[in-house]
């Protein structure tokens, strides 16, 4: 019996499976793993193959879902047009802004995101873990910096975090302790200033992404666990 046609068919099937495989997380990534917690409950999982989850992302303005990616873009391209439309001179929607809401007091978050932007600009892009609280920024020479509110900063150049590249991020948090893993490079920080609680933020703990000028923010996978 000539087995060549069968082998050829099997090889073609395997190639099709590889090509069709999603670029984001697989089923294994929905399994709970943590260094800080023994167990957690998956409260949000999204690969952006459907509509926008407004419970976690809020208003759809400036947000589109294309090819399994959530894309966040500026609402306006010029200050004059924005001021005329909004009838104010602040919060003009000239940069992409995204919030992931309903963050538990103890959590594990795994997501993939990317800032598409020609270059770093002062204070941008900004990723806040807790609104105006813990800041995760990109170093100009590559890598990232964790800045605690009114506390110390920690630079981690080994993570290779950069603009225009997908960032694989894992964050584990409880009051006084946060673990940040970027592209497989991770550390745990214990400090009294490690908090996401902002008493001035009436919407509760959330993640805030701000891109600055000439920027789009892309997300392709999110997993959020509430921990005990």
Model-predicted segments: where are they?
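Extracellular carbohydrate-recognition regions
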Residues: 28-61
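Bacterial N-terminal signal peptides
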Residues: 10-22
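Extracellular glycan-recognition surfaces and repeat-rich motifs
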Residues: 52-82
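Short, aromatic/His-centered strand-loop micro-motif at the edge of beta-sheets
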Residues: 148-170
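Short tryptophan-centered beta-strand motifs in secreted/extracellular beta-sheet-rich domains
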Residues: 48, 109-111, 165-182
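Secretory/extracellular carbohydrate-interaction modules
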Residues: 76-148
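Flexible glycan-contacting loops in extracellular carbohydrate-active proteins
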Residues: 191-220
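Beta-strand-rich interaction surfaces with strong enrichment in secreted/lumenal proteins
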Residues: 33-34, 95-101, 155-161, 208-209
């Amino acid at each position: 019996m000539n087995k060549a046609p069968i082998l050829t068919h099997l090889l073609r099937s395997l190639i099709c499976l590889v090509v069709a495989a999603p670029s984001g997380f697989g089923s294994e990534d929905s399994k709970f793993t943590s260094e800080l917690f023994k167990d957690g409950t998956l409260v949000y999982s999204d690969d952006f193959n459907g509509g926008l989850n407004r419970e976690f992302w809020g208003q759809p303005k400036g947000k589109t879902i294309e090819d399994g990616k959530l894309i966040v873009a500026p609402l306006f391209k010029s200050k004059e047009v924005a001021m005329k439309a909004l009838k104010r001179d602040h919060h003009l929607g000239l940069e992409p802004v995204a919030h992931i809401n309903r963050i538990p007091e103890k959590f594990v978050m795994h997501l993939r995101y990317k800032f598409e932007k020609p270059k770093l600009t002062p204070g941008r892009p900004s990723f806040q873990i807790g609104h105006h609280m813990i800041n995760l920024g990109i170093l100009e020479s590559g890598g990232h910096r964790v800045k605690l509110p009114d506390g110390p900063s920690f630079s981690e150049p080994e993570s290779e975090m950069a603009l225009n590249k997908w960032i694989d991020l894992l964050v584990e948090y409880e009051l006084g302790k946060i673990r940040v893993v970027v592209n497989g490079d991770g550390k745990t920080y214990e400090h009294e200033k490690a908090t996401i609680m902002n008493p001035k933020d009436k919407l509760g703990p959330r993640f805030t992404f701000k891109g600055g000028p000439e920027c789009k923010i892309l997300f392709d996978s999110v997993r959020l666990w509430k921990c005990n």
